[in-house]
């Protein structure tokens, strides 16, 4: 009988130890942020705005090329090499559906807009947003970048899919084409907000 009680005690200690060990070893991941809990400080709001610039600075975006550049007289491509065939096609207005460079530009425009949508939505939901001029300025910066990217889309492709809400799922990432005049109205609205809430640049601005 004593042996049975002893076994029960041993098993109880083992299970307790395993549970405690599991609790001790379970950590919150520090390598990524939870979107729903991310916007809790001005610093994180600024990081979100920097994420929009990260999309803009991609090699295939404004980091190196931009789609209009090869079609300008400043960088007119006359020769063909294996590395610049697709750029050459743009310069000579010989486009087709296999041009992955244009596909990359298309994706990066929407990536930047979606990041701007997430940033604007997150900032607007922050505690004290209504009275915080710093948050308003960060929102204005995101609005300007969204307008800038949307203007690129319209001047390249005319009527395109467009929305001002963040794509929270695969299904919500896609939509029908929107009339360019409607998109222009959104662009003007974003730029007006940016004009009214962004500080003027100074010699100390970075």
Report each predicted region and the residues it spans.
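Conserved, well-structured interaction surfaces
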Residues: 46, 54-60, 82-157, 172-185, ...
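Short, surface-exposed recognition loops and adjoining beta-strand edges that mediate ligand/DNA contacts
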Residues: 36, 63-84, 165, 199-206
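Short edge-strand/loop segments of extracellular domains
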Residues: 166-170
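Membrane-proximal, proline-rich intrinsically disordered regions
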Residues: 21-69, 94-95
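Bacterial Sec-dependent N-terminal signal peptides
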Residues: 1-30
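Short, compositionally biased low-complexity segments
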Residues: 21-28, 86-89, 158-160
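Primarily recognizes Gram-negative and organellar outer-membrane beta-barrels
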Residues: 3, 34, 72-74, 97-101, ...
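Aromatic-glycine hotspot motif
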Residues: 23, 190-191
């Amino acid at each position: 009988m004593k042996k049975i009680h002893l076994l029960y005690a041993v098993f109880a200690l083992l299970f307790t130890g395993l549970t405690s060990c599991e609790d001790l070893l379970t950590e919150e991941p520090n390598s990524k942020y939870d979107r729903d809990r991310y916007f809790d400080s001005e610093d994180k709001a600024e990081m979100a705005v920097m994420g929009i610039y990260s999309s803009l600075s991609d090699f295939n975006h404004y980091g190196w090329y931009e789609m209009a550049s090869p079609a300008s007289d400043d960088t007119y491509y006359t020769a063909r090499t294996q590395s610049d065939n697709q750029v050459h096609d743009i310069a000579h207005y010989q486009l087709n559906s296999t041009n992955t460079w244009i596909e990359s530009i298309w994706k990066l425009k929407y990536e930047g807009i979606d990041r701007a949508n997430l940033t604007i939505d997150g900032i607007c939901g922050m505690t004290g947003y209504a009275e915080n001029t710093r948050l308003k300025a960060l929102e204005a910066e995101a609005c300007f970048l969204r307008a800038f990217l949307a203007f690129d889309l319209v001047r390249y492709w005319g009527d395109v899919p467009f929305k001002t809400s963040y794509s929270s799922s695969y299904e919500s990432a896609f939509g029908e084409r929107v009339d360019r005049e409607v998109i222009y109205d959104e662009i003007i609205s974003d730029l007006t907000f940016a004009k009214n809430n962004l500080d003027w640049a100074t010699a100390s601005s970075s």
